[in-house]
Design a protein with these regions (language model features):
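Active-site microenvironments that recognize anionic phosphate/pyrophosphate groups
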Residues: 1-222, 226-229, 303-305, 319-323, ...
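Helical scaffold of the NTase/Pol beta-like nucleotidyltransferase catalytic core
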Residues: 192-197, 227-252
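Catalytic or ion-translocation cores adjacent to nucleophile or general acid/base/metal-coordination motifs
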Residues: 235, 244-267, 273-334
């Protein structure tokens, strides 16, 4: 049984171009060693193809049976990553192939590396396929929604083990270059099948990789080779455009550098990008204006729920200068009437979420104005999802959400299935503790569908209403509202430029 499963995995590696055919015996022996097995029987007849997750599961079951690992998702993930690494080329070989493809075109290079990152099981395609995805029309264009199911839930034993495990300082975080080839531990994922492409950004060494969770097509991460904190400054714009010049078919953006409006990792300087067109990119300019000294730069307010200034020019240096000017002005800007305060008690509140791209030969930079002030009424943030929407989304509005993609918690899948049953069978959501938080929302939207809702359309209706909530969430994150008053306040800031 073990021999057959190993043979299948080696065949997979050869078919996918991960393992040269001449290394078949060598790779087989590496895998035998991982299992502590001395004996091997080559299958007598050719084996039929099986999906990678099936092959790995049979090997993992064997490892559990032999007492090599515990039967838990955490230990299984650590072990199958070790198995996959036996098939893979070393980092220098991956980098060499990337350079060869890049000589053909940047697109050829990223297509190769993205495919490699999936075939190596660094991106677990069979888990990504579980994510629930849909699109919703809105006043701002077609918004993307995803319920994230690809991050595995840890079982209680693994959680307990992680709590007892010594917190290591190597690698310092999950974005550090030291993750490449790292075997992992119960409280840190294995990255033996991870490969990084070195690139130069702002004359310093950075790394290029893909996100293992792929929230959108070719979702990449670009990170500083040094473990230094996030900071939005002039150099940020230089780095963004250095990358876009290397990979003109990709956008690249940064999370803001303050809590509440920033991402989940502020301790390591990094960006996120990819090969995908978000609703924000398609959104038109609503109000055009010019900034003294930058009359040659196309500038305007974007029709978008967050407060976004878009600047465009053929010369990215003009955009870097102007973006730095806007950032400096925004950092120090206060408008009490609009409830915008640059700082309170010495704590700064204003920052920017920037997104760079190249469109039709012209460089473009979107600057989303952010503010992280809190009040008694809104203790998590005034420009953050308000409490009435927390039943759907209460987490920070980071870069990905700013661009128009909702990443919603996995609990929503089961809650929506239960809610469907309640609505169709005319049961009360109040009878189910997990649905209590949704009751005000259901009471608000359900009456308009009461006569038409049925088994065929209920999924579409719930998805549409979840999408509407997310648009409200984005509007909450906008410093200047999208009505006439808000636009007047926005233009007051523009006049200071």
């Amino acid at each position: 049984m073990l021999s057959e499963s190993i043979a299948r995995l080696v065949d997979y590696g050869i078919r996918r171009g991960l393992t040269p055919a001449c290394e078949k015996i060598y790779t087989t022996n590496l895998l035998l060693e991982v299992f502590g097995e001395d004996d091997y029987q080559e299958p007598e007849t050719p084996l039929s193809e099986k999906p990678l997750d099936e092959i790995l599961n049979s090997l993992l079951d064997e490892a559990v049976k032999r007492g090599i690992i515990e039967d838990s998702i955490v230990y299984r993930d650590l072990f199958d990553t070790k198995l996959m690494n036996c098939l893979l080329p070393r980092p220098a070989q991956v980098q060499q192939t990337f350079r060869e493809r890049y000589a053909l075109s940047p697109t050829a290079a990223t297509e190769y590396f993205y495919q490699f990152s999936q075939d190596s099981d660094y991106i677990r395609r069979y888990r990504i396929a579980r994510d629930v995805r849909w699109k919703v029309d809105s006043d701002y264009g077609e918004i993307d929604i995803t319920i994230n199911l690809s991050k595995p839930e840890k079982d209680p034993k693994a959680i307990a083990a992680a709590r007892l495990a010594k917190s290591g300082s190597y690698p310092k975080c999950q974005l550090c270059a030291e993750n490449e080839g790292y075997a992992g531990r119960v409280n840190h994922p294995a990255r033996e099948n991870h490969r990084i492409i070195p690139i130069t950004v702002n004359n310093s060494p950075w790394g290029f990789q893909y996100s293992p969770y792929v929230y959108y097509n070719e979702h990449c991460i670009v990170f500083n080779q040094e473990h230094v904190p996030m900071k939005i400054e002039r150099a940020t714009f230089v780095k963004l455009f250095d990358f876009v010049k290397l990979f003109p078919h990709y956008f690249l953006g940064s999370n803001a550098d303050l809590p509440i409006v920033g991402g989940s990792i502020l301790s390591h300087d990094h960006f996120q990008g990819g090969h995908y067109t978000f609703a924000m990119e398609k959104a038109p300019i609503e109000i055009r204006f010019t900034i003294p000294g930058y009359e040659d730069v196309e500038t305007g307010i974007v029709k978008w729920p967050l407060s976004v200034i878009r600047i465009r020019h053929r010369d990215e240096k003009r955009l870097i200068d102007l973006a730095d000017h806007i950032l400096t002005a925004w950092r120090g800007y206060t408008d009490e009437e609009a409830f915008v305060f640059a700082e309170t008690d010495g704590t700064p509140h204003n920052t920017i979420t920037p997104i760079a791209r190249k469109r039709d030969g012209i460089f473009e930079l979107d600057l989303a104005l952010r503010n992280n002030i809190t009040t008694e009424e809104h203790p998590l943030g005034v420009y953050h999802p308000h409490a009435q929407w927390h039943h759907i989304k209460k987490e920070n509005i980071g870069l990905i959400e700013v661009m128009g993609l909702a990443v919603l918690p996995s609990r929503l899948k089961n809650e929506m299935e239960l809610l469907k049953t309640c609505i169709l069978e005319k049961k009360s959501p109040a009878d189910y503790p997990e649905l209590e938080k949704h009751i005000p929302w259901v009471e608000e939207f359900l009456p308009q569908y009461q006569t038409i809702i049925n088994e065929d359309n209920i999924t579409d209706i719930l998805q549409k209403e979840i999408g509407r909530v997310f648009v409200h969430v984005l509007e909450d994150a906008g410093v200047f509202s999208c009505d006439a008053e808000g636009r007047k306040a926005f233009l007051r800031f523009v006049e200071t430029l």
